[in-house]
């Protein structure tokens, strides 16, 4: 008897996060971010905002609110967090360490939408270039093992870290 497979694409369960510094309408911006998330194929499960005079340099959002986000991620089976501001590599790593969930910012979400929609070879290459330019300074800490030793074909010899290999690969592309 033939087995039946579920061919439906599972939508990512997404948590939206924003910091309200008072410089713009956070709810309006989150509404737009929710529409972008749905365009990218995600399902927004929850929103978290925090009023702060400025962004936290380590996590963008305060530690108490970050713990609350981690709890939401566990309870709601969140697959991805999307922040409504630009995040540094350190902020991404710190957020992922606390919440245990893949984290991106608004710009990466928009680039992902372009990547999904690009149909021509030239369009796909342009999107790949844009993604690589955006990811290059954010590579530090991405992935689970960045201290891998090289030494194989195509590396710079023993001791080349995964980070260095990835950066060289992106520059070459």
Show which residues each predicted segment covers.
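N-terminal accessory targeting/assembly segments
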Residues: 1-106, 110-111
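Extended, highly charged alpha-helical segments
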Residues: 109-173
